[in-house]
Regions:
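N-terminal FAD cofactor-binding segment of flavoenzymes
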Residues: 45-86
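Glycine-rich FAD pyrophosphate-binding loop
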Residues: 24-49
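Conserved Rossmann-like nucleotide-cofactor binding loop
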Residues: 15, 38, 171
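Conserved N-terminal helical subregion
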Residues: 73-177, 184-190
Length: 203
């Protein structure tokens, strides 16, 4: 089976889904390819990742119709931040701002669980008529020519498109197959991230 689209997007995470949402109503036929099963896209499990979003990110998500799909009691404002350096007395302090992007603001940004962002993005994109989402199969091979990109899936299906977007994580196998390099640095540091409960109010 062969399917032709204007744009092929490998990876239906927040980046791939948001890209597709941006092109709603463009008339372009978009095919999203995601290795995870459909159930994972519909109800992503909590994966421990908390994403800090800026005011601009919030504006983009509002414009795309994603923001209002996130439970209000799971959007946590970041009001103040400090960066400590071991035993040093020096610290970076980011106080609560009074303005952000020319508007009154009462926080630095927002902390939202990654699975909530993924779920909201999928809910928006799944309703778009110009987007087809293929799930449960990965990419076996990628080919490009002057005219198009071709993706061969693990299930044998062949897809083609005028543009190919690799949104399959920072370790993108699609990028590697195309010979596109990346610049990564290992700083030999360890970071401890966890959720904490405390008796005092955040207010």
């Amino acid at each position: 089976m062969s399917l032709h689209s204007d744009i092929l997007v490998v990876g239906a995470g927040p980046a791939g889904l948001s890209f597709a949402a941006e092109l709603a109503g463009s008339g372009l036929k978009i095919t999203l390819i995601e290795k995870s099963p459909l159930e994972i896209l519909q109800n992503p499990p909590y994966d421990g990742r908390e994403i800090a979003l800026t005011h601009l990110s919030r504006e983009i998500m509002q414009r795309l119709g994603m923001w209002d799909l996130i439970p209000k009691d799971e959007i946590y404002p970041l009001r103040d931040a400090k960066v400590l350096n071991g035993q040093s007395d020096y610290q970076l302090h980011f106080p609560q701002p009074t303005q952000a992007r020319g508007e009154p603001a009462d926080c630095l940004g927002y902390l939202i669980s990654n699975h909530n962002i993924r779920k909201a993005a999928y809910e928006v994109v799944s309703k778009l008529e110009n987007v087809t989402i293929l799930t449960g199969t990965g990419v076996k091979e990628v080919k490009t020519s002057e005219d198009e990109a071709q993706v061969i899936l693990e299930n044998g299906e062949v897809l083609s498109g005028r543009l190919l977007l690799a949104a399959d994580s920072r370790f993108s196998q699609t990028r590697r197959q195309l010979g596109i390099s990346s610049d990564m640095h290992d700083y030999s540091r360890t970071m401890f991230v966890c959720r904490m409960k405390h008796t005092l109010s955040n207010q």
